[in-house]
Amino acid sequence: MESRISGHTKLFCLIGSPVGHSGSPAMYNYTFERLGIDAAYMAFDVPLEQVEAGVEAIKTLGVGGFNVTMPDKTAVSHLVDELSPAAKLIGACNTVTVDENGKLTGHNTDGVGFVRNLHEHGVELAAQCCEHLNR
């Protein structure tokens, strides 16, 4: 039994389908443990046809926030209370934050991460045209 999990441990998660291959639980749980954060991260296989029920379950369980992968990104953007400017522009969200009142805000970090990675590898986008395709 995991000794660091208690009745006070905050749960965070990934939803989408399939998620069994995701490295996110290992990455987040390692980070939580190293930083002494009383939290756990799990991946839940939530097919598109069950995404609404999945988001309702997340609300009911008081999950602290969650990530979204395909095929649920667009559907989740219609189930949150608010969208960040990037999520509105893209029409999908990959990260959902939950405030102290349970309000869900959808964000999309795909575009920012893509551009940051290009910049870190010496690719300057000024005056260039590119298209980000998300499957």
Sequence positions of predicted segments:
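Phosphate/diphosphate ligand-binding glycine-rich loop within oxidoreductases
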Residues: 4-126
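Glycine-rich phosphate/diphosphate-binding loop of Rossmann-like nucleotide-binding domains
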Residues: 127-135
